[in-house]
Swiss-Prot record:
The gene is nuoI2. It comes from Cereibacter sphaeroides (strain ATCC 17029 / ATH 2.4.9) (Rhodobacter sphaeroides). Gene3D superfamilies: 3.30.70.3270. GO terms for biological process: aerobic respiration. NCBIfam families: NuoI, PRK05888.1-1. [4Fe-4S] cluster 1 binds at residues 51, 54, 57, 100. The keyword 4Fe-4S applies. The lineage of its organism: Bacteria, Pseudomonadati, Pseudomonadota, Alphaproteobacteria, Rhodobacterales. This is NADH-quinone oxidoreductase subunit I 2. It catalyses: a quinone + NADH + 5 H(+)(in) = a quinol + NAD(+) + 4 H(+)(out).
Length: 164
């Protein structure tokens, strides 16, 4: 009898408690700022692509969902002729963002990627490339690439000199 009364009281309290459900498409819950969602390719402040087609993002990807084809400009700079991500396979781990030396590939908090056909989840370079600088405004890879640190020796280091 006591168990039945406890159950009735519990149900009675829950009837008048505020609801915890949200009508999703109309109302959205706030996401954490570090939510890993859709992947984008960013640009330099000059408007050039940051990606140098080094293929480190594809090598770091544990599910092999990134495909990069490298091309070269007449001045010798590498760029991705083709950059494809298969979001049907992507697990949004963020390893590609960590591996990128130019901060070109970044994960955004946009998590709404659902589609009815798997083929529509393969994004090409044109779909991924945004006009902004992403999380690192003002960063230019080519301004810091290959520059020496002031006060450091520029000669090659002999490993024998490092041994005790």
């Amino acid at each position: 009898m006591k168990g039945i009364l406890d159950s009735i009281l519990r149900v009675g309290r829950m009837i008048f408690a505020p609801t915890k459900t949200v009508q999703y498409p109309e109302e959205k819950l706030p996401l954490a700022p570090r939510t890993r969602g859709r992947i984008v390719l960013t640009r330099d402040p000059d408007g050039q692509e940051r990606c140098v087609a080094c293929n480190l993002c594809a090598a770091a990807c544990p599910v092999d969902c990134i495909d990069v084809v490298k091309a070269e400009t007449p001045d010798g700079r590498w760029y991705p002729e083709s950059f494809r991500i298969n979001f049907a396979r992507c697990i949004f781990c963020g390893y590609c963002e960590e591996a990128c030396p130019t901060s070109a590939i970044q994960l955004t908090p946009d998590v709404e990627l659902a589609d009815y056909r798997r083929g529509f989840l393969q994004y090409e370079k044109e779909d991924l490339l945004i006009s902004g600088e992403g999380k690192h405004p003002g960063y230019r890879y080519w301004d810091v690439a290959g520059k020496t640190i002031a006060g450091k020796a520029q000669d090659p280091v002999d490993p024998k000199d490092l041994c005790p």
